[in-house]
Each structure stands twice: as C-alpha cells, then as structure tokens.
Amino acid sequence: MSDQATALKIKPLGDRILVKREEEDTTSHGGIILPDTAKKKQDRAEVLALGTGKRDKDGQILPFEVKVGDIVLIDKYAGQELTIEGEEYVIVQESEVMAVLN
C-alpha cells in the first residue's frame, strides 16, 4: 500500500484496486483555459493500493497483475469514484484495468 493510501486509511477488499487519475489538463494546446465542463476524464491512473486478492474456485488467492506505483489504463467510467479531503480517487476491480503503461 502506498503512503498516500495508508494516510487515508483506505484498504480495498477482494480484487479491488485504489487508483488516482492523472491530473486533467486545465488549458488547451492553444493556451485556452478550459472550463470544468470541457475537461475530459483521464484514463491513466496510478495504483495506490491493492485489495486482498481474488480467490479461484479452490479458494487460493490469485496474485494481482499490477503493483502499487504502476500507471494503468482504465475506462473513464470505470469503478466507484470517491472524494476524500478534496482529492478524487477511484476504486476499480482488477478486470477493469485494461493495461499497465510503465
């Protein structure tokens, strides 16, 4: 678990992963400041914490394919969004992670 996840006291359960989306662009390529309605959600996120793991049919815990600190690609509508102390986080299932980017 990352220091940030520990400080927040968030521990995902099962095959869930706590991620923080990368910061959104606040200006366009031409230098125009974008209003909140024009910003798009980033699909890149940093893995902050891993759950306990998914169990197979024999009850064995399967290892995660990602690790804390990885930059992953997730769908912009994936997971459950939550805001803690003004910061936005997303809890996704491992199956919602499409790729590891690092």
Swiss-Prot record:
InterPro entries: Chaperonin_GroES, Chaperonin_GroES_sf, Chaprnonin_Cpn10_CS, GroES-like_sf
Record-linked Pfam families: Cpn10 (PF00166)
Gene Ontology biological-process entries: chaperone cofactor-dependent protein refolding
GO molecular function annotation: ATP binding; metal ion binding; protein folding chaperone; protein-folding chaperone binding; unfolded protein binding
SUPFAM superfamilies: GroES-like
Domain of life: Bacteria
Localization per Swiss-Prot or TrEMBL: Cytoplasm
Transmembrane segments: none
Keywords, alphabetical: Chaperone, Cytoplasm, Stress response
Subunit text: Heptamer of 7 subunits arranged in a ring. Interacts with the chaperonin GroEL.
The family this protein is said to belong to: Belongs to the GroES chaperonin family.
PANTHER family listed in its UniProt record: 10 KDA HEAT SHOCK PROTEIN, CO-CHAPERONIN GROES
Function: Together with the chaperonin GroEL, plays an essential role in assisting protein folding. The GroEL-GroES system forms a nano-cage that allows encapsulation of the non-native substrate proteins and provides a physical environment optimized to promote and accelerate protein folding. GroES binds to the apical surface of the GroEL ring, thereby capping the opening of the GroEL channel.
Protein name: Co-chaperonin GroES
Organism: Chlamydia felis (strain Fe/C-56) (Chlamydophila felis)
